[in-house]
């Protein structure tokens, strides 16, 4: 085979793979996702009554008001474009001091010790869920701030607790955004 033929073969193969992998494959799977899973393919967006996007059920948000359940801390301040962990080792003094400060602030605001998920950052920095126990330790504060019966808030937490995927994978969890939106929907 001459060098010119080899170059021609290389150019054709490059074009075939570029069209196949760069165009056909993404278009086919994007089309499939739009048909089979339209909500997830578009970011699992959460909208308010005016159809405005207020978040995603897959990305955590920072809630600081006493009227809301608080999610996990974020090492990236909930900025999705910077998603990732802090990479601090469990023995790192900066991490230990941050966790101690977060735990003290939580205890001052809630009158009880936090669960571990409420003071440790998730790997992505964007986890939208907390554990049911993490929600339970915040129930008294939220019910007091909203002037609701604690049992009413506990019932709502239970209603928004998601089980394990397929009954065996992962742990039970509570989506903080969904729970807080449900709280806003309560009429007294």
Swiss-Prot record:
Keyword Nucleotide-binding: yes
A Pfam family the protein falls into: KdpC
Topology with respect to the bilayer: Single-pass membrane protein
Cell location: Cell inner membrane
Cystine residue pairs: none
One Gene Ontology cellular component: plasma membrane
GO biological process: potassium ion transmembrane transport
Stretches that traverse the bilayer: 13-33
GO molecular function terms listed in the Swiss-Prot or TrEMBL record: ATP binding; P-type potassium transmembrane transporter activity
Highest taxon of the lineage: Bacteria
Keywords: ATP-binding, Cell inner membrane, Cell membrane, Ion transport, Membrane, Nucleotide-binding, Potassium, Potassium transport, Transmembrane, Transmembrane helix, Transport
Biological role: Part of the high-affinity ATP-driven potassium transport (or Kdp) system, which catalyzes the hydrolysis of ATP coupled with the electrogenic transport of potassium into the cytoplasm. This subunit acts as a catalytic chaperone that increases the ATP-binding affinity of the ATP-hydrolyzing subunit KdpB by the formation of a transient KdpB/KdpC/ATP ternary complex.
Family: Belongs to the KdpC family.
Quaternary structure note: The system is composed of three essential subunits: KdpA, KdpB and KdpC.
Entry-linked NCBIfam families: kdpC, PRK00315.1
Record's protein name: Potassium-transporting ATPase KdpC subunit
Species: Gloeobacter violaceus (strain ATCC 29082 / PCC 7421)
